[in-house]
């Protein structure tokens, strides 16, 4: 993957104000969706659903609520795999490497152009496809290079997976999350 030509994280006007949204039109994949700010809570889920600027799904409404309640100036939704699927069982059986590489380029852009806190929020969905933990490791490596902190909200699953945003209490607060230890112990 080339790092010398990172894309520019650009804010554009959409319903409700300024948003980060890549690609800029609805596609069968999405790399970035979020509100503009310098210190975002970057939520890492498994795959995007139908949300877009001004039309958030219930998961992203929860992400926005928790970012605001915990004093982050913004939030960005990112996913381990960028294919849109309202049902994670519909995700590709074999990952599209071009989509994965472009996803990593956009993550690098977010890391280079903001001062984020990463939120592990994929729940048990990381077990849906065998390739997801490997893709997660690639993302974690990028955050390790920049010493980016990781957090999670709520109780972890029996297997240790971080809680999905959809079912979190309104008063949830972030807790430090050792994402590398998690990956080593769970996969």
Where are these regions (language model features)?
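Residues at the starts of beta-strands that form the adenosine-phosphate
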Residues: 40, 73-74, 117, 149
